[in-house]
Regions:
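Active-site-proximal helix/loop segments of hydrolytic enzymes
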Residues: 1-153
Length: 153
């Protein structure tokens, strides 16, 4: 879930590892990655990564892996399920240098399922039905992604 300024933002978005394609994506990456500073021994755990330094974001962009195309395909499947089957507004697939996607050894995505600053969306996200639909959409997207991979190999 995402907290955004104001209460007009709503919908889902899915991130894959990538270079910052917009100023907004760079700001999201900086904000999301800043939480590592709260951890004990973050410099050791993250090999000197400092979300405040531009060099760290350049380093993240260099770690775009061979799994990038597969990550994008999985992210597209998730957004398709959210829009067509779950009835959510899709804010699209985006790329950003998010630490949670760094150095993965498999396709990886970060799914933002909604904005808690939007009152109706917060209510939906807190409901059992909303949680079931969101989880079901992610499951179907992964199942379809897996079936596509197996059919092409």
């Amino acid at each position: 879930m995402v907290a955004a300024k104001g209460n007009g933002a709503h919908g889902t978005e899915t991130y894959t590892m990538g270079i910052h394609t917009s100023k907004h994506n760079l700001e999201v990456a900086k904000r999301e990655n800043a939480v590592v500073l709260m951890e004990d021994n973050y410099q050791k755990n993250y090999q000197g990564f400092d979300p405040k330094l531009p060099e760290s974001h350049i380093l993240l962009s260099l770690y775009q892996s061979a799994y990038n195309d597969n990550s994008i395909k999985l992210a597209q499947n998730i957004q398709h399920q959210f829009k067509s089957r779950v009835g959510r507004k899709s804010r699209g697939v985006k790329q950003a240098g998010l630490l949670v996607l760094w150095k993965t050894t498999a396709p990886s995505v970060l799914v933002e399922v909604g904005f808690i600053t939007h009152p109706q969306e917060e209510k939906y996200l807190n409901s059992k039905l909303g949680q079931m639909y969101i989880a079901s959409g992610i499951f179907r997207a992964f199942r379809d992604y897996k079936n596509e991979l197996e059919a092409n190999s």
